[in-house]
Amino acid sequence: HPPVAIEDFFIAEQIEDYYLLFGQLVKYKRADLAIEAFNRLGKPLLVIGEGEMLPQLKRMANDNIRFLGKQPFEQVRHYLAHCKALIFPGVEDFGIVPVEAMASGRPVIAFAAGGALETVAEHTTGLLFREQTPESLISAIESFEQIQSKFSPESIRGHAKDFGRNTFKRNIKQVIDAQLSEV
């Protein structure tokens, strides 16, 4: 997996009352699941990103969902650091955004597939939902609301460091050293 610039993110003193969906708004990222779930829950959701699904998602969304479009990195950092949790409903080979949220000390609520299985440590750095349905996501969010105080921003950030540049460099060096020792 690619290295993530953990040091570019920070832990906020105050968490605000919103969940965050961040990324390209294309079909396979399944933002529609998040929109449907948050329409039913009525909880605040901020959506950062652009893409072919944006017009359809805006038409679907109730007033508790705000679309912020593309944002500069400084704003993205702010929203990541202050959200209750990142919502990650799609399947990615790796998925850098969940690790960026964790680098900000924030839990991730992700679909249990692809890279999220490697990056999200259940009940330590977030929660996984097992079916790619609004109902399954709603259930995970409701569970999160019951236990959110148990998540430690420092522990979450510590876990993110496993995917940082220093770990990446160390792992690459070990692979190269092992190959060179066989020559």
Predicted regions mapped to residue ranges:
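Short alpha-helical donor nucleotide-sugar binding micro-motif in glycosyltransferases
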Residues: 78-83, 172
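Conserved donor-binding/catalytic core segment of Leloir-type glycosyltransferases
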Residues: 4-46
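Nucleotide-activated donor-binding/catalytic signature segment of Leloir-type glycosyltransferases, i.e.
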Residues: 54-77
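Acidic donor-binding loop of glycosyltransferase active sites
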Residues: 81-93, 106
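A charged, aromatic-enriched C-terminal amphipathic alpha-helix characteristic of glycosyltransferases
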Residues: 132, 149-178
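Short hydrophobic beta-strand element within catalytic cores of glycosyltransferases
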Residues: 87, 107-112, 120
